[in-house]
Protein backbone atom coordinates (compact mmCIF):
# COMPACT_ATOMS: atom_id res chain seq x y z
CA UNK A 1 0.00 0.00 0.00
CA UNK A 2 1.21 3.51 -0.85
CA UNK A 3 1.42 6.02 2.01
CA UNK A 4 1.59 9.80 1.72
CA UNK A 5 2.99 12.23 4.26
CA UNK A 6 -0.12 14.40 3.91
CA UNK A 7 -3.69 13.30 4.58
CA UNK A 8 -4.99 15.49 1.76
CA UNK A 9 -3.51 16.42 -1.64
CA UNK A 10 -2.80 19.97 -2.79
CA UNK A 11 -4.64 21.86 -5.51
CA UNK A 12 -2.96 21.35 -8.88
CA UNK A 13 -1.50 17.96 -7.93
CA UNK A 14 -1.63 15.27 -10.64
CA UNK A 15 -2.72 11.91 -9.25
CA UNK A 16 -3.65 8.35 -10.15
CA UNK A 17 -7.25 7.53 -9.29
CA UNK A 18 -9.48 4.46 -9.52
CA UNK A 19 -13.06 4.98 -10.69
CA UNK A 20 -15.40 3.58 -8.02
CA UNK A 21 -18.92 4.79 -8.86
CA UNK A 22 -20.29 6.50 -11.97
CA UNK A 23 -23.46 8.62 -11.93
CA UNK A 24 -25.12 10.93 -14.45
CA UNK A 25 -23.78 13.94 -12.55
CA UNK A 26 -20.21 12.74 -12.05
CA UNK A 27 -18.10 10.03 -10.49
CA UNK A 28 -16.51 9.08 -7.19
CA UNK A 29 -12.90 8.00 -7.45
CA UNK A 30 -10.33 6.80 -4.93
CA UNK A 31 -6.89 8.42 -4.90
CA UNK A 32 -4.32 5.62 -5.02
CA UNK A 33 -1.49 7.73 -3.60
CA UNK A 34 -3.56 8.88 -0.61
CA UNK A 35 -4.64 5.55 0.83
CA UNK A 36 -7.78 5.32 -1.29
CA UNK A 37 -9.10 8.74 -0.20
CA UNK A 38 -12.41 9.44 -1.95
CA UNK A 39 -12.63 12.35 -4.39
CA UNK A 40 -15.44 13.67 -6.56
CA UNK A 41 -15.10 14.10 -10.32
CA UNK A 42 -17.92 16.40 -11.53
CA UNK A 43 -19.56 15.76 -14.90
CA UNK A 44 -18.35 19.19 -16.10
CA UNK A 45 -14.72 18.12 -15.46
CA UNK A 46 -14.85 14.80 -17.34
CA UNK A 47 -14.20 15.98 -20.91
CA UNK A 48 -13.56 19.22 -22.77
CA UNK A 49 -15.63 17.82 -25.65
CA UNK A 50 -19.35 17.01 -25.64
CA UNK A 51 -20.01 13.48 -24.43
CA UNK A 52 -23.47 11.95 -24.68
CA UNK A 53 -22.96 9.38 -21.94
CA UNK A 54 -20.49 9.74 -19.08
CA UNK A 55 -20.06 5.95 -19.10
CA UNK A 56 -18.47 6.22 -22.55
CA UNK A 57 -15.53 7.91 -20.83
CA UNK A 58 -15.53 6.48 -17.30
CA UNK A 59 -15.75 2.81 -16.38
CA UNK A 60 -15.76 1.44 -12.83
CA UNK A 61 -12.41 0.05 -11.58
CA UNK A 62 -10.49 1.75 -14.40
CA UNK A 63 -7.49 3.87 -13.46
CA UNK A 64 -7.46 7.49 -14.62
CA UNK A 65 -5.10 10.43 -14.22
CA UNK A 66 -6.71 13.46 -12.60
CA UNK A 67 -5.81 16.96 -11.45
CA UNK A 68 -6.89 18.21 -8.01
CA UNK A 69 -9.02 21.35 -8.49
CA UNK A 70 -10.52 21.90 -5.01
CA UNK A 71 -9.59 20.84 -1.49
CA UNK A 72 -11.70 21.63 1.58
CA UNK A 73 -9.32 20.85 4.44
CA UNK A 74 -11.98 21.52 7.08
CA UNK A 75 -14.43 19.02 5.59
CA UNK A 76 -11.75 16.71 4.19
CA UNK A 77 -13.26 16.71 0.70
CA UNK A 78 -11.46 16.74 -2.65
CA UNK A 79 -12.69 17.54 -6.19
CA UNK A 80 -10.71 16.48 -9.24
CA UNK A 81 -10.71 17.04 -13.00
CA UNK A 82 -10.01 14.70 -15.89
CA UNK A 83 -10.17 17.28 -18.67
CA UNK A 84 -7.64 19.66 -17.09
CA UNK A 85 -4.81 17.09 -17.30
CA UNK A 86 -2.59 17.86 -20.31
CA UNK A 87 -1.03 15.17 -22.51
CA UNK A 88 2.42 16.06 -21.14
CA UNK A 89 1.20 15.83 -17.52
CA UNK A 90 -0.41 12.48 -18.29
CA UNK A 91 2.78 11.10 -19.83
CA UNK A 92 4.96 12.25 -16.92
CA UNK A 93 2.51 10.89 -14.37
CA UNK A 94 2.47 7.48 -16.04
CA UNK A 95 6.26 7.29 -15.79
CA UNK A 96 6.20 8.45 -12.17
CA UNK A 97 3.44 5.95 -11.30
CA UNK A 98 5.49 3.04 -12.61
CA UNK A 99 8.35 4.13 -10.33
CA UNK A 100 6.00 4.41 -7.35
CA UNK A 101 4.66 0.91 -7.98
CA UNK A 102 8.20 -0.49 -8.14
CA UNK A 103 9.10 1.30 -4.91
CA UNK A 104 5.94 0.04 -3.20
CA UNK A 105 6.69 -3.58 -4.17
CA UNK A 106 10.25 -3.39 -2.84
CA UNK A 107 9.12 -1.82 0.45
CA UNK A 108 6.34 -4.40 0.84
CA UNK A 109 8.76 -7.33 0.48
CA UNK A 110 11.43 -5.81 2.75
CA UNK A 111 8.93 -4.94 5.49
CA UNK A 112 7.64 -8.55 5.40
CA UNK A 113 11.20 -9.87 5.84
CA UNK A 114 11.76 -7.58 8.82
CA UNK A 115 8.28 -8.27 10.24
CA UNK A 116 7.54 -4.55 10.25
CA UNK A 117 4.60 -2.67 8.73
CA UNK A 118 4.56 -1.17 5.26
CA UNK A 119 3.82 2.18 6.86
CA UNK A 120 7.09 1.84 8.79
CA UNK A 121 8.85 1.24 5.48
CA UNK A 122 7.39 4.37 3.94
CA UNK A 123 8.14 6.52 6.99
CA UNK A 124 11.66 5.24 7.64
CA UNK A 125 12.82 4.68 4.06
CA UNK A 126 10.76 6.32 1.31
CA UNK A 127 10.02 9.60 3.05
CA UNK A 128 13.62 10.05 4.22
CA UNK A 129 14.96 9.38 0.72
CA UNK A 130 12.38 11.74 -0.77
CA UNK A 131 13.40 14.51 1.65
CA UNK A 132 17.10 14.07 0.83
CA UNK A 133 17.07 13.22 -2.89
CA UNK A 134 13.58 13.92 -4.26
CA UNK A 135 12.97 10.54 -5.93
CA UNK A 136 13.16 7.53 -3.56
CA UNK A 137 13.36 4.76 -6.18
CA UNK A 138 16.15 6.52 -8.09
CA UNK A 139 18.06 6.89 -4.81
CA UNK A 140 17.62 3.18 -4.05
CA UNK A 141 18.79 2.18 -7.54
CA UNK A 142 21.81 4.45 -7.14
CA UNK A 143 22.58 2.85 -3.77
CA UNK A 144 22.52 -0.61 -5.39
CA UNK A 145 25.25 0.56 -7.80
CA UNK A 146 27.28 2.86 -5.54
CA UNK A 147 26.80 1.57 -2.01
CA UNK A 148 24.81 1.91 1.19
CA UNK A 149 26.19 5.37 2.05
CA UNK A 150 23.44 6.92 -0.10
CA UNK A 151 20.81 5.38 2.19
CA UNK A 152 22.67 6.10 5.42
CA UNK A 153 23.24 9.76 4.47
CA UNK A 154 19.47 10.16 4.11
CA UNK A 155 18.92 8.85 7.64
CA UNK A 156 17.56 5.41 6.71
CA UNK A 157 17.86 3.22 9.86
CA UNK A 158 20.54 0.51 9.63
CA UNK A 159 18.01 -2.32 10.03
CA UNK A 160 16.60 -1.48 6.58
CA UNK A 161 19.82 -0.95 4.63
CA UNK A 162 21.07 -4.47 3.80
CA UNK A 163 17.67 -6.11 3.09
CA UNK A 164 16.65 -3.08 1.05
CA UNK A 165 19.73 -3.30 -1.18
CA UNK A 166 19.31 -7.07 -1.57
CA UNK A 167 15.67 -6.77 -2.62
CA UNK A 168 16.22 -3.72 -4.84
CA UNK A 169 18.95 -5.53 -6.78
CA UNK A 170 16.31 -8.12 -7.79
CA UNK A 171 14.03 -5.38 -9.07
CA UNK A 172 16.50 -3.50 -11.27
CA UNK A 173 14.86 -1.62 -14.13
CA UNK A 174 13.92 -4.08 -16.86
CA UNK A 175 15.27 -3.87 -20.39
CA UNK A 176 13.19 -1.72 -22.71
CA UNK A 177 11.60 -2.98 -25.92
CA UNK A 178 10.13 -0.92 -28.77
CA UNK A 179 7.34 -1.94 -31.13
CA UNK A 180 6.54 0.22 -34.16
CA UNK A 181 3.94 0.47 -36.90
CA UNK A 182 3.43 2.63 -40.01
CA UNK A 183 0.05 4.07 -40.98
CA UNK A 184 -1.29 6.54 -43.53
CA UNK A 185 -3.65 9.29 -42.40
CA UNK A 186 -5.81 11.31 -44.82
CA UNK A 187 -8.75 13.67 -44.42
CA UNK A 188 -10.59 16.27 -46.49
CA UNK A 189 -12.13 17.83 -43.39
CA UNK A 190 -11.64 21.56 -42.72
CA UNK A 191 -8.92 22.07 -40.09
CA UNK A 192 -7.58 18.65 -41.02
CA UNK A 193 -4.49 18.85 -38.80
CA UNK A 194 -6.59 19.58 -35.72
CA UNK A 195 -8.95 16.76 -36.65
CA UNK A 196 -6.04 14.31 -36.91
CA UNK A 197 -4.70 15.45 -33.52
CA UNK A 198 -8.13 14.86 -32.02
CA UNK A 199 -8.30 11.32 -33.44
CA UNK A 200 -4.82 10.50 -32.11
CA UNK A 201 -5.66 11.88 -28.65
CA UNK A 202 -8.84 9.79 -28.43
CA UNK A 203 -7.06 6.66 -29.64
CA UNK A 204 -4.49 6.91 -26.84
CA UNK A 205 -6.97 7.42 -23.99
CA UNK A 206 -6.35 4.94 -21.15
CA UNK A 207 -3.85 2.88 -23.17
CA UNK A 208 -0.99 3.42 -20.69
CA UNK A 209 -3.31 2.65 -17.77
CA UNK A 210 -4.49 -0.59 -19.43
CA UNK A 211 -0.94 -1.81 -20.11
CA UNK A 212 1.15 -1.23 -16.98
CA UNK A 213 4.52 -2.16 -18.52
CA UNK A 214 4.40 0.68 -21.07
CA UNK A 215 6.89 3.52 -20.66
CA UNK A 216 6.17 5.75 -23.64
CA UNK A 217 3.94 6.08 -26.73
CA UNK A 218 4.66 8.37 -29.68
CA UNK A 219 2.69 8.97 -32.88
CA UNK A 220 4.41 11.31 -35.32
CA UNK A 221 4.57 12.14 -39.01
CA UNK A 222 7.47 10.90 -41.12
CA UNK A 223 6.22 12.77 -44.18
CA UNK A 224 2.52 13.24 -44.90
CA UNK A 225 0.42 11.17 -45.13
CA UNK A 226 2.63 8.60 -43.37
CA UNK A 227 2.78 8.40 -39.58
CA UNK A 228 4.84 6.20 -37.28
CA UNK A 229 3.50 4.67 -34.05
CA UNK A 230 6.18 3.80 -31.46
CA UNK A 231 5.38 1.90 -28.27
CA UNK A 232 8.13 1.49 -25.64
CA UNK A 233 7.75 -0.85 -22.68
CA UNK A 234 9.37 -3.58 -20.62
CA UNK A 235 7.07 -6.43 -21.68
CA UNK A 236 7.26 -7.42 -25.39
CA UNK A 237 3.84 -9.09 -25.37
CA UNK A 238 2.10 -6.08 -23.79
CA UNK A 239 3.92 -3.64 -26.09
CA UNK A 240 2.76 -5.62 -29.14
CA UNK A 241 -0.82 -5.82 -27.83
CA UNK A 242 -0.82 -2.10 -27.07
CA UNK A 243 0.44 -1.27 -30.58
CA UNK A 244 -2.35 -3.35 -32.13
CA UNK A 245 -4.92 -1.73 -29.83
CA UNK A 246 -3.74 1.79 -30.70
CA UNK A 247 -3.90 1.12 -34.45
CA UNK A 248 -7.34 -0.47 -34.06
CA UNK A 249 -8.51 2.58 -32.08
CA UNK A 250 -7.10 4.94 -34.72
CA UNK A 251 -8.94 3.19 -37.56
CA UNK A 252 -12.24 3.02 -35.64
CA UNK A 253 -12.18 6.62 -34.39
CA UNK A 254 -10.90 7.83 -37.76
CA UNK A 255 -14.01 6.43 -39.47
CA UNK A 256 -16.22 8.26 -36.97
CA UNK A 257 -14.38 11.53 -37.63
CA UNK A 258 -14.03 11.28 -41.46
CA UNK A 259 -10.31 10.59 -41.21
CA UNK A 260 -9.10 7.70 -43.39
CA UNK A 261 -6.44 5.61 -41.64
CA UNK A 262 -4.85 2.49 -43.08
CA UNK A 263 -1.97 0.27 -42.01
CA UNK A 264 1.22 0.28 -44.09
CA UNK A 265 3.31 -2.00 -41.88
CA UNK A 266 3.21 -3.50 -38.39
From Swiss-Prot:
Does Protein biosynthesis appear among the keywords? yes
Q: Where is the S1 motif domain?
A: 12-83
Q: Does the keyword Oxidoreductase apply?
A: no
Using the record for this protein, list the coiled-coil segments as residue ranges, or answer none: none
Q: Please name the InterPro entries in this protein's record.
A: NA-bd_OB-fold (IPR012340), S1_domain (IPR003029), S1_IF2_alpha (IPR044126), TIF2_asu_arc (IPR022964), TIF2_asu_C (IPR024055), TIF2_asu_middle_sf (IPR024054), TIF_2_asu (IPR011488)
Any GO molecular function: translation initiation factor activity
A single GO BP term for this record reads: translational initiation
Summary of subunit composition and partner proteins: Heterotrimer composed of an alpha, a beta and a gamma chain.
Q: Which family does it belong to?
A: Belongs to the eIF-2-alpha family.
Q: Which NCBIfam families match?
A: PRK03987.1-1 (NF003062)
State the protein's purpose. eIF-2 functions in the early steps of protein synthesis by forming a ternary complex with GTP and initiator tRNA.
Quote the protein name from its UniProt record. Answer: Translation initiation factor 2 subunit alpha
Species annotation: Saccharolobus solfataricus (strain ATCC 35092 / DSM 1617 / JCM 11322 / P2) (Sulfolobus solfataricus)
Q: Which gene encodes it?
A: eif2a
